[in-house]
């Protein structure tokens, strides 16, 4: 299938898209967080995988997906996603890849595959999905498209799987101002459980201060300024669980739009690394997507011919992040399996207890990754 490069498939991110995407990001993070657990999700990865799958849905299944994905109709979302992903991956820092794997026993609808190519530049594969060989091809595809950060997404294939839609993202960026050895000091981090541990903290003066009743934070730009690392530290008297529960798309947008630029922040941030993997079905059900996971109610009649009760049997999401003095490497992969059947002291921010962080696209202020670090 050839992809037409024309702009008919694009709509530039505007306020309507930003509101939908930030609300999806906040809900996904909030509904997936469980008390005290270090968590990392990539709203961009999950949104892309689900936006891709909704092109095969109809009826109430489609309506629920549209609502959960921020309330845009699917044609508009396809156009926004095309423009947004092209825009994000224009530099070297971020790579986004999509693929559709169809079991050799079924015929995927041409119109669905064409949309996957036109709007998501997806690679299309057809293979016996439950074979070990295909599982290993899928894992190598994910490993390659996350620069090796996520070596595998599935252990073995579900015998009932008729299609797998996979999104992979790799982010690798250096800080605009890297840390020197003299910027590193050993400080104590108090984890969610209260245990204390000495670890390497990176110290710097930043000049974008974030404040939101009950939390303080900062943004630290990566080289070229396209992306930034943002961290939010709830005040001592604010419980991190309550803070996360209070997040919303509007609140996220507001934190960034009211960022105080050129206001010095004395930052101390631990080096950290996190790997996370989750089966997202329960989270997505909390977000109102129900029929897609129910073999009786699911309507994926635009996905495959002879649609015999196709439903979503798995939504695997894996993420990885590493933040050190050089910069940040992060990756995410989402697999949707369709089964049938100058006064630095003014604003000190020391991330020495659980904190929320994001990798943000500075043009739209949308989080590509959002996580909470509860231990080091």
List PLM regions with ranges:
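Short, cationic low-complexity segments
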Residues: 248-262, 343-348
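Mature N-terminal segment immediately following signal peptide/propeptide cleavage
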Residues: 22-29
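Non-catalytic, conformational "gating/processing" segments within enzyme and secreted inhibitor domains
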Residues: 36, 78-235, 242, 260-342
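Single conserved hydrophobic/aromatic residue that forms the stacking wall/gate
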Residues: 1-9
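Short Gly/aromatic-enriched secondary-structure transition segments
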Residues: 65-69, 179-186, 241-250
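Post-signal peptide N-terminal segment of secreted/secretory-pathway proteins
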Residues: 30-94
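Extended hydrophobic
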Residues: 165, 216-232, 344-376
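Acidic/histidine-rich, surface-exposed loop or edge segments in extracytoplasmic proteins
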Residues: 10-11, 44-48, 60-67, 117-125, ...
